[in-house]
């Protein structure tokens, strides 16, 4: 059965389904077919085991240990593990020498030294004092036309407000 998996790089290659020998499936669709066919053939699926290195490999349960020891995809996984452990060792050895630069900013001091007043929508500024608190006058402007008023409620009823009745 392993001969059908040797050229898995060709997406158009036909592979035989391990659950139904009459099924010839293109390699690019094979994983999807395996999932569907496994559900349709639970009796055959219970006799087969999935290779831990390649889910496309479905082998009889009695032969899984032999397949694991001789699987071609095992070398790819082992090489990935070796590369990851090497990179982790190199990362732990190389300690960072970066240091935070000294901070010479003082935002509070800059705020008091600021000559222009901050912009606040809907307010006017009258004072010459540079204190930020004294620059803002609490005079609210009404920009609506003389015949218009602000609505007293939202244009829709909120779900938790049911005409003043508690639920």
Curated annotation (Swiss-Prot):
Broad class of where this protein is predominantly found: cytoplasm
Residues that coordinate or bind Zn(2+) 1: 17, 23, 33, 37
UniProt xrefs under InterPro entries: TRM13/UPF0224_CHHC_Znf_dom, UPF0224_FAM112_RNA_Proc, Znf_C2H2_sf
BP term (GO), one: spermatogenesis
Subcellular location, record wording: Cytoplasm
GO CC term, one of those recorded: piP-body
Zinc finger (CHHC U11-48K-type): 14-41, 48-75
Modified residues (Phosphoserine): 8
Coiled coil (residue ranges): none
Keyword line: Cytoplasm, Differentiation, Metal-binding, Phosphoprotein, Repeat, Spermatogenesis, Zinc, Zinc-finger
Entry binding sites for Zn(2+) 2: 51, 57, 67, 71
GO molecular function: tRNA binding; zinc ion binding
Reported function: Required for spermatogenesis and is involved in the suppression of retrotransposon transcription in male germ cells.
Family as reported in the entry's similarity comment: Belongs to the UPF0224 (FAM112) family.
Name of the protein in question: Gametocyte-specific factor 1
Organism: Homo sapiens (Human)
């Amino acid at each position: 059965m392993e001969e059908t998996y040797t050229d898995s790089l060709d997406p158009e290659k036909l592979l035989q389904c391990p659950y139904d020998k009459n099924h010839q499936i293109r390699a690019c669709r094979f994983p999807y077919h395996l999932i569907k066919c496994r559900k349709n053939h639970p009796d055959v699926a219970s006799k087969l085991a999935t290779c831990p290195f390649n889910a496309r490999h479905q082998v009889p349960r009695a032969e899984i240990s032999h397949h694991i020891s001789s699987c071609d995809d095992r070398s790819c996984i082992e090489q990935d593990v070796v590369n990851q452990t090497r990179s982790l060792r190199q990362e732990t050895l190389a300690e960072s020498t970066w240091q935070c630069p000294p901070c010479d900013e003082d935002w509070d001091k800059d705020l008091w030294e600021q000559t222009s007043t901050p912009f606040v929508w809907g307010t006017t500024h009258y004072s010459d004092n540079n204190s930020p608190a004294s620059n803002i006058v609490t005079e609210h402007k009404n920009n609506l036309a003389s015949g218009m008023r602000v609505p007293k409620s939202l244009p829709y009823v909120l779900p938790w407000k049911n005409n003043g009745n508690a639920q």
